[in-house]
Amino acid sequence: MTDESTADAGRDFIRDIVAADLASGKHKSVVTRFPPEPNGYLHLGHAKSICLNFGIAEEFGGCCHLRFDDTNPTKEEQEYIDAIQRDVRWLGFDWGKNLHYASDYFEQLYAWAQHLVRAGKAYVDDQSQEDIRLARGTLTEPGRDSPFRDRPVDENLDLFARMRAGEFPNGARVLRARIDMASGNINLRDPVLYRILHAPHPRTGTAWNIYPSYDFAHGQSDSIEHITHSICTLEFEDHRPLYDWFLDNLPVPSRPHQYEFARLNVTHTLLSKRILTELVRGGHVAGWDDPRMPTLAGLQRRGVPAEALREFIKRIGVAKANSTVDVGMLDFAIRETLNKSAPRRMAVLRPLKIVIENYPEGESEELEAVNHPDDPSRGTRRIRFGRELYIEQDDFMENPPKKFFRLSPGREVRLRYAYFVTCREVVKNAAGDVVELRCTYDPATKGGNAPDGRKVKATMHWVSAAEAVPAEIRLYGHLFATAQPDAANFASELNPQSLETLSGMVEPALARDDTDGAVQFERQGYFCRDRDSSPGRLVFNRTVGLRDTWAKVAAAGS
């Protein structure tokens, strides 16, 4: 974090600029935009941009446009358009009537390209893509002029019109801006404005055989929509001179200004759209909404509340310098949000059966359990207690170390909402594995307190063997094992333990709950019901643990 980020105050350098522009009268109102390309699913980085652009508009009484940058028809699909709109709404924002597409402006963009040609500031180039790349030069060497750079205006206009009409094959010609092949900024070395592409467009069909570049479409679309503050990430900082060049040389209706902020980088995470696509296509994950993915669809399926994501983004702030945020900050925001909202239930992830030998056979009783310890208004529920129960395997050790206070032979513990129990006998199978515990209970300790004042050092959760419901429990961890995964070798850094699937037992209330919202499994973490659930088959995803277990594992292995 830099000193330019003032997240605690809810202000940052971009908001300061907006406030100053409004105070000075430079702008009467603020208009921002979020302009995704519909060629994939939104991820954490997009969430930061969404919250910034929509948040600024909301805070300053303006509006934010949702504009799809649909200038590459071979990569764009309606599936992504629909998903992006769902994700923006899920985050809590609404573009109202301001839904736009760059393709809405294709005719105007074409006319402006002709304007540049007539002014001698654009030309048709017959060179191949590779020849153009080689002639562009390097950071230390100037570029070389195209042999077609001085084509007559009339010839350029004719060729450009024929490009549009579809007379030439893909790659045969491009339209380039005529700026400065010796510029120290490579983006100003006669960038491509249009390329030939014989491909149907999702919205315009086969009407166009040429498509504008992002750099040409972006700023002019901003101007058409009267965007006041065009906010993007730092990798576009070197594109700003080109953004301004187009606005300076075209009869545009308004003059937006581009501002750049640091993109979001998170530990144990890669946000490259290319890598995310390869993860999906390579079968490393189960789709774009796999709960391990940093996509907004994946976060939703994992059970992350939009409120937690907005709070996380608010806390990391907006800065001018790139940095990496510990994923633990996101986990903290999730825990803090869910701690307030999630009802409590009991679930045993790795069941170990216990038999309470002095509890009457064939009998059971109802006990009262609170739904939320900090909110009495959430009420209570009834849970059934009987002779046979399930506890966590991890809550028993036959030969415990000094600081292990849970169940062991001869030790007494408290069962939550129920009684004190003592382990009397350990039952093992032929392989020597513990399969059952024989215990006794103290009937006088109902509710969890002993009349004689004796204390126990552990309270454990449990479920009734007679009434518990089987459930598949999916424990999700970091997708990448290393904190700073190498994008070039991402496949080798995948965490082999990023998903563990367990066969657990849960209290029957979880089968009756008709909500897909989050729930806290007491002493375990926050979980949500997965869409794979069906009648007779419960599936739960872990959203986040109650504490940072990863840090403990990492420390133990170091």
Curated annotation (Swiss-Prot):
Annotated TM spans: none
GO MF entries: ATP binding; glutamine-tRNA ligase activity
Sequence motif: 'HIGH' region, positions: 36-46
Binding-site list for L-glutamine: 69, 214
InterPro entries: aa-tRNA-synth_I_CS, Gln-tRNA-synth, Gln/Glu-tRNA_Ligase, Gln_tRNA_ligase_bac, Glu/Gln-tRNA-synth, Glu/Gln-tRNA-synth_Ib_cat-dom, Glu/Gln-tRNA-synth_Ib_codon-bd, Glu_tRNA_lig_a-bdl
Residues that, per the record, bind ATP: 37-39, 43-49, 233, 263-264, 271-273
Class of the enzyme per the UniProt entry, highest EC level: ligase
Domain of life: Bacteria
CC per GO annotation: cytosol
Any single biological process term in GO: glutamyl-tRNA aminoacylation
Family: Belongs to the class-I aminoacyl-tRNA synthetase family.
Subunit structure: Monomer.
Full protein name: Glutamine--tRNA ligase
Annotated organism of origin: Nitrobacter hamburgensis (strain DSM 10229 / NCIMB 13809 / X14)
